[in-house]
Amino acid sequence: MKGTIIKGIGGFYYIKIDNSEEIIECKARGKFRHTELTPMIGDYVEISIDKNNKGAIEKIYERRSELFRPAVANVTQALVVFSFKNPDINIDLLNKFLLLCEYNNLKAIVCFNKMDLVNKEDYKDIISMIEQAGYDIIFLNAKEERNMDIIKKLIKDNVTVFCGPSGVGKSTMLNKIIGKETMITGNISEKLKRGKHTTRHSELIYVDEGLLVDTPGFSSLDINFMEKEDLLHCIPEFRDFIGECKFTGCLHHREPNCAVKKAVEEGHIHKDRYNFYIKTLEEFMNRRKKKW
């Protein structure tokens, strides 16, 4: 049988079988320890069931993508959720989430929630910065379900992770999207023993022909595992100017005749995105100096 790992806890993995609402509890075969391949939420797997009705993961199919913070496989897109007010927007944090999406080859869609609290015109420079970077933006008021129909359409045929700081309304969005009528409730709830006040672990939820990553650990992030060379490739606006700088390996920092810096001066790259890049690059370089 084949299916998708929707939850993993204490060495047990819960697999939703293809074309069924059946959830089977499995352990991973010992052979995976020798390959250093650990099953992850989102993995598409092949399982067997022995005569004692015990399940075992026999094969993990090739992953399209891997996230390690949180640990989820085969995610296709991220909804990066922020609000302008309550809490006030942190531009550097938003840019860090976008960096992480680029690093993991995820399509990022920026969702500004709680739009009933603000005048969009007051934040047009931030909006311009995100649009100029090439990201789609959706303006929401999740409590009143404003534009939630757009979100539901995006989820179809995708594995979607919600990310963003605490308090911006991610839980409200999830609740509006999932709804009691669309959750596979009884079977999953019984198998996973998920109570109202239990400790939460990452899991996948099937809804509207798509999968949602419901995770408690994607509200803040650390990008210190990245190298400065990674950073260069995680700012999509730079890509049109790669190879046009005077020096090979240009970091677009203090080097002369830099095509990226010229693009900033000419308004092709937003100055705030470039300033964020320089700030982050210098943090990475200072970190490396401290190691030595």
From Swiss-Prot:
Species: Clostridium botulinum (strain Hall / ATCC 3502 / NCTC 13319 / Type A)
Keyword vocabulary terms for this entry: Cytoplasm, GTP-binding, Hydrolase, Metal-binding, Nucleotide-binding, Ribosome biogenesis, RNA-binding, rRNA-binding, Zinc
Compartment(s): Cytoplasm
UniProt domain CP-type G: residue ranges: 64-221
Major site of localization recorded for this protein: cytoplasm
Protein name stated in the entry: Small ribosomal subunit biogenesis GTPase RsgA
A GO MF term: GTP binding
GO biological process, one term: ribosomal small subunit biogenesis
